Swiss-Prot record:
A Pfam family recorded for this sequence: TFCD_C
Keyword set, alphabetical order: Cell junction, Cell membrane, Chaperone, Cytoplasm, Cytoskeleton, GTPase activation, Membrane, Repeat, Tight junction
Subcellular location: Cell junction, Tight junction; Lateral cell membrane; Cytoplasm; Cell junction, Adherens junction
Gene3D superfamilies (alphabetical): Leucine-rich Repeat Variant (1.25.10.10)
Name of the molecule in the record: Tubulin-specific chaperone D
InterPro entries: ARM-like, ARM-type_fold, TBCD, Tubulin_specific_chaperoneD_C
Provenance organism: Mus musculus (Mouse)
Presence of the UniProt keyword Cytoplasm in the record: yes
Gene Ontology cellular-component annotations: adherens junction; bicellular tight junction; centrosome; cytoplasm; lateral plasma membrane
Length: 1196
């Protein structure tokens, strides 16, 4: 909970976690036991081959990693796994590679289970000492491939050196037969340990463990401890953390010293503690940039401090209950006093005369510095050290430590100090070292920490502080009796609820929820704790919108939390740096207003109005949003009791609301980047005040609002791109609400001069040279209420239709066309349909054709620019608008849906459903199926309805993922069997089959081949298909978007024998027409991709018989003489393959010569040379030589 680092400012919060991650994989036993046995038995066989060895190692690693979160499941199997591997190690016949592999497997197990559990399983008899030592002789500390071996050997040695015999007994006679003296065992072990303390790999950690076990032995400490400490301190003093070698050396020394002072007896280590502390001071570790060194420094300092102080349990500490169940029952028995705080019954500490060594002050000082370190792991270690030290100090000195910790919570300190202070307080509280007399001070700073949020640049810091503050509350719940915390229950419970619901960071919300749950369970004094927990549990608070808008309303239903939650939103969240939090806070205030409307109106609303004039942009923005939401909430409350909103708001508040826009305008706050936020906020204010029916009708304020909306729509191109859409939407929504409330004279009649000028003004803006202005005013026209459109409908539809048409000057204005289509659709919904109605007031028989023309015309918008296929936005809007219009007509006036119109709509949508962009294909499929299955009433004249319903049954529609090509294309290609849809589906498929995206090409091609396979035996259907295919080609000649892809598709169809049935007939019309179209397509073309595709098609067409074959070969030989070398080479290569494929193409006598010419000629040589070889081929194959056509002389 508290170990999470501060998240990066740019990191987006993960609101929804994957269920599999949340649940994790709960295992019950080691299920791979048999596989592991087999794997270990196979090591002697696989270790010789590198590939087999790596496969075995990777498989074992995968098996072990599966148990990283539940390593205890391995415990029953550790012994046999270790024995199997050590047998390989101890076998004298094992090769070095096999030994290293066995140690590598041992390390993998150790990594999962932890070395401390693993140590006790190593063989540790006297007989093992010498073999383990001997194994080190063959080790090279610089060999990076075998570091696992050295690591495991050091751990093994650390166990074997614990044998209960003096090492001198193992040495015997140290003299050898050659007169040399052998090194004593004790010295050998120490030399090994010292040498590995300065290596750069993992063996350094194991060497520190070895030192701690070895140096603290009774026989070794007398002879070697002083000299080792002297060596390590000298090495430490002469090392610098400015170099890599120095960092490695210092890390090893610090680890060794920390382990010695942890495992050694106090009386053995005490004589050296002061010297070590002085050396450590001289190293200046807090100045190091290496986290590991600073952490080890703090760890060593605290262990030195614990060495200075006698190990004892402070008699003055606060105790809640006992570890013994029997003792707890005695305390709870009748007649027994339940004194929990021993200091209350003791006027003096039994050890008050205990002399505290001088070094303790230095240790405490360094630990307090560690609390402010920049890294969490260092602060965490320092906090634990503070807790351990305070537990051995007299009461007064421990209280001074608590006071020093509380000094971390000043606003001059950084967020690091606050975080470290919270961790320290949690440790002190958990250990009973924070006496109840200090609780009032501690709770005060913790409440501040729970809302700590400091602005830093474009974001803020403090999430880790709030998280740690939740940990303090969690620790206090376990540490204190309910009566001790009773005075603070209201404040703590409210603060935790606020953090759980309103904190921006998901980890903090979850930490607060956990702390609240712990307090409810342990203390039992939190108001409505169980009810709140069931709603605001760990998983529920994961979604921030759910927290702000739903959970907060439930909790605010309990009066203890209502006002604190509202006050927190106003004071801390309305002015938050994150715009999303400000918007959510405003909506949350809207939802909370019904709980205490009088408090909101009398106290909160005046404060919000004052904040609207703040010089801080974020405060001003949030306050305006909040005023808008609260006003609308008060209006809804007033409406329920047939009252006016002014019954809640006094005249001063109403006037202040009216003046917000003018005050911002006078201060020029609508300009620049901040102006974007102000425009957005005031547009929302306009919308909410209009919906709240504020009494501003006929007031100049309304004119000011109208000016702001118009100016915002007109200047959208000046708004940053990421905010543009949102600002346009809020301005349009404001316009709708404003017109509906303030421009109505009588029901259904416009009553303002501004209203009458609005439509002509907006229609004029539709011709603006700025695309965004067209977008804004198109959307505005679409959002106008029906009474304003009455009498102007034809004029508006004509203006919007001009926006949707492509002209040479606005080809790239795809967004304007998209918004124009949406506006037309929205207007149709607004004015309604009446077949015989007036065309200037409703959609009727006279103007429906104009609407159809606009929508269907945009279905063929394939505009592309630097952003890609921007026309897809237009086509998507056209599909949606057509669907909405068709459904509207079906419900009201189905007679206006004519058969040819319905057929065109369905065919156009089917074409889009077979194209290459996944998202738009899926949208088209949804539109197509909606139109097909709509039954209220059914849409008339749908072509092939019965066949479509059998192909796309209603029950199966929901299960198909239309975004996935593998699921979409097998269904879409079935439409090729329906003559009405064949042309359009084939047109769409051509783009998909000939596209670039691998998955789309593969699945669309496969589905097309499956269809073609099914019609091979039906000559009539195949003939119809081929005619449609040629029709598509003919209609899209020189349209590179379709023709290039179509050529690729034709190549695939020819190569897969889809037209084999036509090859039996000489000069088949399909081949003749296809050749004509290909020649026309590539005539004078310089498009390399198109030319290459056409070469492939021409080579595939050679399979057809008759005179047409000669014409095809002539065309190919023309390409062999093409001006582009790359085309000549490509043609020669494919013709070579073609000759190999179709053996009847060339006479056997000349085959070798033809193949030789094709393969040996340098087709990228000069044109005269190439054409000579090309002509030679023509002669060999009996094809007329191509003749150069002289260029006409100008003026001749």
């Amino acid at each position: 909970m508290v170990l999470s680092n501060e998240p990066a400012a740019s990191a987006a919060e993960e609101e929804v976690e994957d269920d599999a991650l949340v649940r994790a994989s709960a295992l019950e036993a080691f299920g791979e036991s048999a596989e592991t046995r087999a794997l270990l038995r196979s090591l002697p066989a696989v270790h010789r081959e590198r590939a087999s060895r790596e496969v075995a190692e990777e498989r074992f690693r995968v098996i072990m990693d599966k148990y990283q979160e539940q390593p205890h499941l391995l415990d029953p199997h550790l012994e046999w796994m270790m024995n199997s591997l050590l047998d390989l190690v101890q076998d004298e016949t094992s090769l070095p590679d096999l030994v290293h592999l066995a140690f590598k497997f041992l390390y993998i197990i150790t990594k999962v289970r932890g070395y401390k559990v693993f140590l006790r399983l190593f063989p540790h008899e006297v007989a093992n000492v010498q073999p383990v030592l001997d194994m080190f002789t063959g080790q090279n500390p610089k060999d990076h491939e075998t570091w696992e071996t050295r690591y495991m050997l050091l751990l093994w040695l650390s166990v074997t050196c614990l044998i209960p015999f003096d090492f001198s007994r193992l040495d015997g006679n140290l003299s050898t037969q050659t007169g040399e003296t052998r090194v004593p065992t004790m010295d050998r072990i120490l030399q090994i340990a010292e040498s590995y303390l300065v290596v750069s790999d993992k063996a350094r950690d194991a060497a520190a463990v070895l030192v701690s076990k070895f140096i603290t032995r009774p026989d070794v400490k007398q002879r070697k401890m002083a000299s080792f400490l002297d060596w390590s301190l000298c090495t430490l003093a002469h090392s610098s953390f400015q170099t890599i070698e120095g960092v490695i050396t210092m890390d090893g020394m610090l680890q060794a010293l920390a382990q010695i002072f942890k495992h050694g007896k106090r009386e053995d280590c005490l004589p050296y503690a002061n010297t070590v502390l002085q050396c450590l001071d001289g190293c200046r570790l807090p100045e190091s940039s290496h986290t590991s060194l600073r952490k080890l420094g703090v760890k060593l300092v605290q262990r030195l401090g614990l060495t200075f102080l006698k190990p004892k349990v402070a008699t003055w500490r606060y105790q809640r209950g006992c570890r013994s169940l029997a003792a707890n029952l005695k305390l709870c028995a009748p007649g027994k006093s339940d004194q929990k705080l021993l200091s209350d019954s003791l006027t003096s500490d039994g050890d008050e005369d205990y002399d505290v060594p001088e070094g303790v002050e230095t240790v405490i000082e360094q630990l307090l510095v560690g609390l402010k370190d920049k890294d969490t792991v260092v602060r965490w270690s320092a906090a634990k050290g503070i807790g351990r030290m305070a537990g051995r100090l007299p009461r007064e000195l421990a209280d001074d430590v608590v006071g020093s910790v509380l000094d971390c919570f000043s606003f001059q300190e950084t967020d690091k100090a606050w975080h470290g202070g919270c961790l320290a307080l949690a440790e002190l509280g958990r250990r009973g070292l924070l006496l109840p007399s200090r609780l009032s001070e501690v709770v005060t700073v913790i409440l501040k920490a729970l809302t700590y949020d400091e602005k830093r640049g474009a974001c803020s810091v403090g999430a880790n502080v709030r998280d740690a503050a939740c940990y303090v509350c969690w620790a206090f719940a376990r540490a204190y009796e309910p009566q001790e915390l009773t005075p603070f229950v209201t404040a703590i419970s409210s603060a935790l609820v606020i953090a759980a619901v309103f904190d921006r960071n998901v980890n903090c919300r979850r930490a607060a929820s956990a702390a609240f749950q712990e307090n409810v369970g342990r203390q039992g004094t939190f108001p409505h704790g169980i009810d709140i927990l069931t709603t605001a549990d760990y998983f529920a608070v994961g979604n921030i919108s759910n927290c702000f808008l739903i959970i907060s309303v439930f909790i605010a239903g309990f009066q203890e939390y209502t006002k604190p939650m509202i006050d927190h939103l106003v004071s801390m969240k309305i002015n938050h740096w994150d715009g999303a939090i400000r918007e959510l806070s405003a909506k949350a205030l809207h939802n909370l207003t019904p709980q205490v409307p009088e408090y909101i109106a009398m106290h909160v609303f005046p404060a919000l109005l004052l904040m609207t004039q703040s010089p801080d942009l974020h405060t001003r923005h949030g306050a305006i949003l909040a005023c808008a939401e609260v006003t609308y909430a008060l209006y809804k409350l007033a409406t329920q009791s047939n009252r006016l909103v002014t019954d809640y708001l006094d005249e001063k508040a109403v006037q202040s609301l009216k003046q917000i826009h003018q005050q911002l305008c006078d201060r020029h706050l609508y300009r620049g980047l901040g102006g974007e936020l102000m425009r957005q906020a005031v547009c929302i204010l306009i919308e909410k005040l209009s919906l709240s029916r504020m009494p501003f009708k006929g007031d100049a304020t309304v004119e000011g609002w109208q000016w702001l909306i118009n100016d915002t729509l007109r200047s959208l191109h000046l708004v940053s791109s990421h905010s543009r859409q949102q600002i346009k939407e809020v301005a349009v929504s404001a316009l709708t609400a404003l017109c509906s409330e303030y421009y109505v004279k009588e029901p259904g009649e416009a009553g303002s001069s501004i209203a009458k000028e609005l439509i002509p003004q907006y229609l004029a803006e539709l011709q603006s040279p700025e695309e965004m202005a067209r977008c804004g005013f198109s959307s505005a026209l679409g959002a106008l209420p029906g009474f304003l459109l009455r009498g102007h409908l034809q004029q508006v539809l004509s203006g919007l239709r001009r926006v949707t048409c492509i002209s040479p000057n606005d080809v790239s204005f795809a967004e304007a066309r998209r918004d124009g289509l949406k506006a037309i659709s929205r207007i149709c919904q607004t004015v309604g349909v009446n077949t015989r109605g007036p065309p200037d007031e409703v959609i009727c028989k006279e103007n429906i054709s104009e609407v159809y023309a606009a929508l269907l015309g945009c279905m063929s918008d394939y505009t592309t620019d630097s952003r890609g296929d921007v026309g897809a936005w237009v086509r998507e809007a056209a599909m949606t608008s057509l669907m909405d219009l068709m459904l509207l007509l079906a419900r009201t006036e189905p007679v206006l849906i004519e058969a040819h119109i319905c057929e065109r709509v369905m065919c156009c949508v089917a074409q889009q459903a077979s194209e290459k962009i996944d998202r738009f294909r899926a949208h088209a499929a949804r539109v197509f199926l909606t139109l097909l299955h709509f039954d209220s009433p059914p849409i008339p004249h749908v072509p092939h309805r019965q066949e479509l319903e059998s192909l796309f049954p209603r029950s199966d529609v929901a299960t198909v993922n239309w975004n996935a090509p593998s699921q979409a294309f097998p269904l879409i290609t079935q439409l090729l069997g329906l003559p009405t849809y064949r042309y359009h589906v084939l047109l769409g498929l051509a783009v998909s089959v000939g596209g670039l995206t691998e998955s789309t090409v593969r699945h669309s091609t496969q589905s097309l081949f499956e269809y073609m396979k099914g019609i091979q035996k039906d000559a009539q259907v195949l003939q119809s298909f081929s005619e449609t295919l040629l029709k598509v080609f003919e209609d899209n000649l020189l349209n590179d978007r379709v023709s290039v892809s179509l050529l690729k598709m034709l190549d695939q169809l020819l190569a897969n024998g889809c037209f084999d049935i036509f090859t039996a007939e000489e000069n088949h019309p399909f081949c003749v027409k296809l050749l004509t179209l290909c020649k026309e397509e590539i005539k004078k073309s310089k498009d390399i991709q198109k030319l290459r595709s056409s070469i492939a098609v021409l080579c595939g067409m050679v399979q057809f018989n008759g005179d047409v074959r000669k014409k095809i070969l002539l065309q190919l030989f023309l390409l062999l003489g093409h001006p582009f070398p790359v085309i000549r080479k490509s043609t020669a290569s494919q013709v070579y393959e073609m000759v190999l494929t179709y053996s009847d193409l060339v006479d056997a006598e000349v085959l070798d010569e033809v193949m030789s010419v094709l393969s040996d000629t340098a087709w990228d040589a000069e044109l005269p040379v190439v054409r000579e070889q090309r002509n030679r081929l023509c002669d060999l194959l009996g094809v007329p030589r191509p003749q150069l056509v002289p260029k006409p002389i100008p003026g001749s």
